[in-house]
Amino acid sequence: MLTIEQIRRIAQQSGARDITKVETDIVLTYVLQLFHEKGITEHIAFKGGTMLRKMIFGPRGRYSTDLDFTRRTDITDEEVMEMMLDALGEPYHGLSFRFDRDKDWYFTDRSLAANPVCLHAGNERGVKIKLEVSLREQPVLPARALPQIEQEYFQLLPFKPAAIPSLAYEEVVSEKVRAASQRSKIRDLHDLSEVAGRAFNRDLLRSLAVIKLWESDKAIRRPDRRR
């Protein structure tokens, strides 16, 4: 993991006021690389606000501590969890992970979620992030391996950030449309406002949004299989 001095320098050079946001972004880059090296991304596709910022929007994107994914193979719920637990069970390039398996990992009828604390020598209190894998539906469109937008700190990393299998752009946005229609959170509206100024396939987005809303309604009507 980068030293706290390096993180401070990166924050100063980028004009960031909050060093914690810079630190968190670096931590998320490490976790994405870890999941890539452990083969987890062969079964899940990156999506959500952090995906949009890291792969599409760059610095204009919204800050988030979440890494959101969706399952894209026939791997079971429990197998996904075991792969993630195994990956976070050991230190990775100076980054350690603290969590209570019984409290910080949980299933709903739609997803697997976890809240590990990521620690390193410069921050023993750690940074808490959220991991979530949607289990309710597989991608409509094929996932594509997308490169992360180059950051100045990439040259300081002990690895070259890998391209990460991600949902197609219009499919990510269609899930934002669905989320905005269901919960109207500022984060979704922020992401959609950034989308509005960019080129995209409107007909495809409209069709995907209808499918996502239909799938969501079907999931709500379905009994919770874990009760």
PLM regions with names:
Residues 1-44, 55-67, 71-227:
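Structured mid-to-C-terminal alpha-helical surface segments
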